[in-house]
Swiss-Prot record:
This is Exodeoxyribonuclease III. Its EC number is 3.1.11.2. The record marks N153 as: Transition state stabilizer. Disulfide bonds: none annotated. It catalyses: Exonucleolytic cleavage in the 3'- to 5'-direction to yield nucleoside 5'-phosphates. Monomer. It holds the Pfam family Exo_endo_phos. The active site is at Y109, D151. Major apurinic-apyrimidinic endonuclease of E.coli. It removes the damaged DNA at cytosines and guanines by cleaving on the 3'-side of the AP site by a beta-elimination reaction. It exhibits 3'-5'-exonuclease, 3'-phosphomonoesterase, 3'-repair diesterase and ribonuclease H activities. Mg(2+) 2 binds at D151, N153. It comes from Escherichia coli (strain K12). One of its GO terms (biological process) is DNA repair. Mg(2+) 1 binds at E34, D258.
């Protein structure tokens, strides 16, 4: 069973990248983030013709997530319990039948946070991680197959930082988000529920693979970026992970997203 997570940075701007992902990877499940399209305007017909059940949770111009599944899900949930109409459309979940059992897939576009001293964005990021933590602890069991995927906007370890030592120190000094100590605490707490970072587990020493590259500084040309797009699997699912990677080929296409797709394959 193959999962692909991709921050598409505008679904209607990049159908060519989604088509390329389907053709190359033939995934069973695709999680898209930052679709940037209101539900009323979602290009359902165009996406469904790729051979998927399509579920989406979006708003005009910002944020937005979608799940594409080969198998028909048992259940789909949009947003966290307690989200109101004003909540940013950042998370969609599904329970999907498979040979691995019913897999709970949580696809999220996590807040970026901007910087420690931002009065709105940083607390919103902390709250989002707390909401996910609460959901795991109250709604799910760690001995069941669970996969959290998406643009999580945190680099879990220093191996996941590829912007140069000078920039790394400056970001920490100025409180810029992505690998602040507080953010690492949120991530560690999430992982301690019983999750495995599939890429890092398979590549414990790799320090030159990233998933986000800044457009402005042409970071992709020099492989300067951050690994912030993750697939986190519960232990029973992680034990079935046979392959995982970051697709630089898709990132190198014309008019690309600033993110590369990340993927993992599981077999019983």
């Amino acid at each position: 069973m193959k999962f692909v997570s991709f921050n598409i940075n505008g679904l209607r701007a990049r159908p060519h990248q989604l088509e390329a992902i389907v053709e190359k990877h033939q995934p069973d499940v695709i999680g898209l983030q930052e679709t940037k399209v209101h539900d009323d305007m979602f290009p359902l017909e165009e996406v469904a013709k790729l051979g998927y059940n399509v579920f989406y949770h979006g708003q005009k111009g910002h944020y937005g997530v979608a799940l594409l599944t080969k198998e028909t899900p048992i259940a789909v949930r949009r947003g966290f319990p307690g989200d109101d109409e004003e909540a940013q459309r950042r998370i969609i979940m599904a329970e999907i039948p498979s040979l691995l059992g019913n897999v709970t897939v949580i696809n999220g576009y996590f807040p970026q946070g901007e910087s420690r001293d931002h009065p709105i964005k940083f607390p919103a990021k902390a709250q989002f991680y707390q909401n996910l933590q609460n959901y795991l602890e109250t709604e799910l069991k760690r001995d069941n197959p669970v996969l959290i995927m998406g643009d999580m906007n945190i680099s879990p370890t220093d191996l996941d930082i590829g912007i140069g030592e000078e920039n790394r120190k400056r970001w920490l000094r100025t409180g810029k988000c992505s690998f602040l100590p507080e953010e690492r605490e949120w991530m560690d707490r999430l992982m301690s529920w019983g999750l495995v970072d599939t890429f890092r587990h398979a590549n414990p020493q790799t320090a030159d693979r990233f998933s986000w590259f800044d457009y402005r500084s042409k970071g992709f040309d020099d492989n300067r970026g951050l690994r912030i797009d993750l697939l986190l699997a519960s232990q029973p699912l992680a034990e079935c992970c046979v392959e995982t990677g970051i697709d630089y080929e898709i990132r190198s296409m014309e008019k690309p997203s600033d993110h590369a797709p990340v993927w993992a394959t599981f077999r019983r």
